Amino acid sequence: MTVVERFLKLVSYPTTSDEASETCPSTARQLALAQELVRQMQDMGIADAHVDQDGYVYGTVPANCDKKIPVYGLIAHMDTSPDAPGENIRARITEPYDGGDIVLNEEKHIMLSPKEYPQLKNSVGKRLIVTDGTTLLGADDKAGVAEILSAAQLLLTSEKPHGTIKLAFTPDEEIGRGADRFDVKGFGADYAYTVDGGALGELEYENFNAASAKIEICGKSIHPGSAKGQMVNAALVAMELHGLLPALETPYYTEKYKGFYHLVAMRGETEQAELQYIIRDHDRAKFEARKAVMEKACAEIDRRYGAGTAVLTLRDSYYNMKEKIAPCMFLIENAKKAMESVGVTPKIVPIRGGTDGARLSFEGLPCPNLCTGGENFHGRFEYIPADDMETITNLLAQLMWQLAE
């Protein structure tokens, strides 16, 4: 099975995670994919492949040499983002891309265009795997899963020496729970890489510091005909509070190392309203300052309308793994060398998000992030060059061989 064939099979399994669920995994359908991965691993000779009670898949590629070297791991996640539909994915492979518009859905007039996504120009001459414009593709992160499994197949069928390699596939990464029940001790790796990045060549060991904020607004309803000087409209107060935050510090206006406040959801009526935000920044001090801005905005609303009008709940989600990777920069240097060995130019970029590896790094498993080749994650215009998946499969195998030298 080629990596592309494997990927197309994996995306046929709907695995959208659900933040409202309290189970692990959050959706039962992730277990169906987990069982499929165990079957594939067993078929290639990974004898200890199994799925645990929480839906995590583990397995081992045994060492084929006697040299004493650290145990390395490769990790990807099985779920797809709830931000876009993830069922009935109709993936197809295009002809080698010519640089123009790609018709995703002729009936609905949906196009994938370099005018909107100029990075498409980097894939001229390559076959692209695309959607029909009505669902996401699931390259985040089933491309990573497929690439790891196909690399494992290469390692198992080659006589080139490598050490013990641990594989893991996690549920619920997209809703921030991928590392919640990860068995770091049982996994048994000294170091690992997640394969959950974007375009070919991306190599990441810096991620956002992340927090979530929920603000509950308590209003005061009274008949609008006699409300003068008495009504407190919670929906309007919510809008007022949002206006106290920096208008140009949202995802739309920011890139690279610039952090943001992102209003994820809002609902409101006269008596009650609720705002939900995520707060992000690479710099820890700026991250703490952003949370303080949120606290100050709520305090100002309380000053205007009375104590208890704005009730803020802040929760840290994960932190920048840079401080945990810095003592292990050989992981980055070896990844760069492996990329160059397969003709890929490494591009170190900050992750404008998080990975399972970010949290695992703080649990004693240093875990930078490697590219999958995918683009436009979490949406209907997601795509991945098939040729890049093949390159990344070879890159992963080369990295494991290299680490045994």
Q: Language-model segments: which ranges?
A:
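Active-site-adjacent substrate-binding region
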Residues: 236-253, 260-264, 309, 319-368
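Short helix-loop-beta-strand segments that form the rim/entrance of peptidase-like active sites
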Residues: 153-175, 256
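Short glycine/serine- and small hydrophobic-enriched flexible loop segments
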Residues: 149-156, 240-247, 398-401
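Zn-dependent metallopeptidase/amidohydrolase metal-coordination segment
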Residues: 269-271, 345-403
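A non-catalytic alpha/beta surface segment that caps or lines the substrate-entry region
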Residues: 22-69, 73-75, 79, 89-90
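Midchain, well-structured core segments that form catalytic/ion-binding scaffolds
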Residues: 102, 117, 126-139, 172-302, ...
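Active-site metal-coordination/substrate-binding segment of hydrolases
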Residues: 67-161, 189, 391
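N-terminal capping segment at the start of a domain
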Residues: 2-28, 130, 318, 378-379
